[in-house]
Amino acid sequence: MAHKKGAASTKNGRDSNSQRLGVKRYGGQVVNAGEIIVRQRGTHFHPGSGVGRGGDDTLFALVAGAVQFGTRRGRRVVNIVPGE
């Protein structure tokens, strides 16, 4: 007979990689055109003036300026206030 118990197998021990979502540039921060403002799944934030939306719902700056968060028709929107 064995004096040591055989090592048991387990079906656990895995986890998926984080998606690194969230706001990347906050209100008042100055951004250049093309910079990512928000990484999101679905439209938690909607694009406003000077902001574009990618195929994965990522919001990015179309123009250089300061980031501004607000609401429009009950939706959270992100605008870019162009710099002088």
Curated annotation (Swiss-Prot):
Matching Pfam families: Ribosomal_L27 (PF01016)
A biological process (GO) of this protein is: translation
A single GO cellular-component term from the record reads: cytosolic large ribosomal subunit
PROSITE patterns (alphabetical): RIBOSOMAL_L27 (PS00831)
Which PANTHER family does this entry report, sorted A to Z?
LARGE RIBOSOMAL SUBUNIT PROTEIN BL27M, RIBOSOMAL PROTEIN L27
The molecular function terms of the Gene Ontology recorded here are: structural constituent of ribosome
| Chain segments carrying region Disordered | 1-24
Stated family: Belongs to the bacterial ribosomal protein bL27 family.
> What's the protein name?
Large ribosomal subunit protein bL27
